[in-house]
Amino acid sequence: MTSSIREWLNLSVRWFHVFAAIMWVGQTYYFTWLDGQFNRLEKKAAGDETPPQVWMVHSGGFYAVAKQKSLGVLPEQVRWFRWEALMTWLSGMVLLFLVYYSSSGLIDTDVANISQAAGIAIGLTVLLGAWLIYDSAARSPLGKSEAAFATFSLIMIAAISFGLMHLLSGRAAYMEIGAMLGTIMTANVWFRILPSQRKMIATAAAGAQFDASLGAQAKLRSKHNTFMAVPVVFIMISNHFPVATYGNTYACEILVALVLIGWGAAKIIREA
């Protein structure tokens, strides 16, 4: 592959990746905001069985959205939100291979004298291993406590960041953490949120009362995704600021601190 073709491929995939991410994160925060509005309206109208509506104005019209407790249309008429997450992850993985796994950007011999193959193996192991650890923790009693789970997650991110900063180049280590969080977010959508939603739709279509825990499980993973999205976006743009981020003497500490700041920002947005 010539350098010119590689550069255009890099640019095209990056463009696609950013736009897909905008669509995914945008809809995630939109529904997060909607849920917050519905919760406030339900508290005000305690005892009223009429589904509350959120009124909005956008472009050239007014919109009224109501949250339903039953399925009022055929299952095939329900709009799913899934491809945005998959397209974001797939394009991100292509970028990871283009920029790091198939180039010299992955390894820094001043950091660790390892082979390219070893670096790739480390990177892929982190992506899979982090999901398995996160998912196990989220399904355990630890996942029922927001403070305990947040503490565990921060320790996990800090430990993996520290390890990667001593094995890969600083830039690759940062992007690997971003890819790790993005992989967890996508796996949440496809392996936890969508299966719960399928069961909810199938049960509702059959005229039965669906298990409320299904919705709670999907909502919890969606909540986790809103907290991971902000640090991921930061990591995406960190490439442009090497002195302040991955090239800094305190690169690992800066990354962990900015994950915390990102979580704080996400909490503010969620409560707006």
Regions found by a protein language model. Give the residues of each.
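Polytopic transmembrane helical bundles with strong interfacial aromatic enrichment
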Residues: 1-272
